């Protein structure tokens, strides 16, 4: 998990502004969308935000649930870093959500693996 990982997360009902603030504060380019018990419902990435803005939606009405990617790629907390890297490469993504039985644990970022010498 990212050393600076403070578990970026929002609720589905959170506004676009709340999503952007969370992503900016946690500095991972992604936030998980969870329910009140921290079950993972989806993720929102910087790319999701850019695509949403390109579509000229009414941003004052957008909620996290409206723009999240459901069923994101995940990995378990006991998986090896090599497996995380394999999932990132195969899916051409830079972040991977860590879950344990559907509960949100955190985010592994490609930069984490780079810093630790796995790449």
Predicted regions: what they are:
Residues 29, 60-63, 71, 92-94, ...:
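A short pocket-lining beta-strand/turn micro-motif at the edge of beta-sheets
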Residues 30-66:
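A beta-strand-loop signature enriched in Asp, Gly, Thr, and Trp
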